[in-house]
Amino acid sequence: MIKLSAIGLKLATMLATSALGLVLAPSIAHADVVFFEKDGWSVYTRGLIASHYQLALGDPDPPTTHGVLVGGKILTPSVTDGCGRMETNPIPGQPPVCKPTLTLSRIRSGFIGTQLGVGVRRAITPTVKVDSLVSINLADISSNRNQEINKSVDVREAWASVDTPAGTFKFGRQFMIFGSGSAPVVLISHKYAVGNPCFVNFPTIACASVGAGPMYAGFDAQLRYETPRFAGLQFQTAVSDPWVGPDFQITPYPRVDFELNYDQSFSETFRARVFLQGVLQQVQRRNPTTNELKKGNVVGGFGSAVVNVAGFAIGGGGWQCKGCGTRQVFEVGVDSSNPLAFDKSFDLRTSRGFFGNAGYTLLGYTLAAGAGAAYVRPTNGDAPELLGGTPSTSVSVLHSSTEFHVTFSKQIDALALSAEYMRWANKWHYGEKQDVNYAGLGANFLW
């Protein structure tokens, strides 16, 4: 049984009070808005405008006596709020010690919270159709007072697909296959919520529960083929621009993703989906001193499933990957000099994750809850090197990120209001810990 802290009780009370204020109203599903259609051509738009208040209370990135923390850090740079609470001194007979706390409050808008997509469709024949989409996200519009100097736009997607009776050929910058099976599970609870903001004082708006079980697939240039669906089954494969990281050079081979999925509606209220995914990519680095070329293979497997019955939705998944972090393939994280996906010797670390969500929707109200965990296995190179009995070049690698959350939302036509709470815990291999509570309220307009 989980015992809530005083902070957790205050946040839960705030969310319960806010949730009661949402007004009962009919809801509809959003759809593309077609504003031009003629002679087999159509132009449509889709988008999202959102603003979320988020309060983060808990621990800042912890100190370490093992050189540096790798992975899991949430601050850029470190932000604390003085002496937050007194704790028992580990040295017997000594007075209590002060433990700094984190208190951050932001109104977030931009990035995931502000999107505009424009697409063009063309019917070449009755059985051959082309679809396309260019989706633009604003890097950040939270403030003009230096919370984020960069005000650029991010062309997140730019793809076209050719649908034929023999299958679909899709090309351009698009969501990658491996890890994308997390999305249907995450959306059960975080369709309109923020969750973990990735970095609490950085302007990005939403990581949801990614990093503690679910993966973020990411976007890159691809050539993808999808077979026709038969008895609910479909196979997809894609070759993609390879990922590179600090001190790694691009390889002569593209990354390969593949998926076998099952999607079947047994009635108007009963639908089942299953996703089995894999990824393979060679990575390489040339030692500038010895000119030695070192190669490795990023290899991962992923599986998830979602079942919808009437207003209920339940889903879960798991994965393991060599050369992945807790959030994505070949993850670097906040510290580019200490990436999570590989160590100082450029050996690839292995990570794994598990996650699940359940929710119920009635009259446009959705109440959902879930939990997840991700784990990182250190390499032999992560062991401390002792010099005079003191760790000299050692690191403390992230051991685990775990979380549980509750979200509540109300859809009113094209508007969606949300309230949420999340408890996030990081633990590193030498015992460093971090617990953070996230709470938020949001408003979304989507089309």
Indicate residue ranges for each PLM-predicted region.
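Sec/Tat signal peptide C-region and signal peptidase I cleavage site
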Residues: L24-A31
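Outer membrane beta-barrel
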Residues: V33-Y53, P77, K99-V244, P252-P254, ...
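Transmembrane beta-strand segments of Gram-negative outer membrane beta-barrel proteins
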Residues: F36-P92, Y192, V274-L276
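Transmembrane beta-barrel outer-membrane domains
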Residues: K38-G40, I107-G113, N150-V155, P214-G218, ...
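Transmembrane beta-strands of outer-membrane beta-barrel proteins
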Residues: V43-S51, R122, P126, V130-V134, ...
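Transmembrane beta-strands of outer-membrane beta-barrel pores
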Residues: S51-L57, I136-D140, F175-I177, V239-W243, ...
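Detector for outer-membrane/organellar transmembrane beta-barrel domains
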Residues: P63-G67, C98, F258-V406
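Outer-membrane beta-barrel "beta-signal"
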Residues: F258, K410, D435-W447
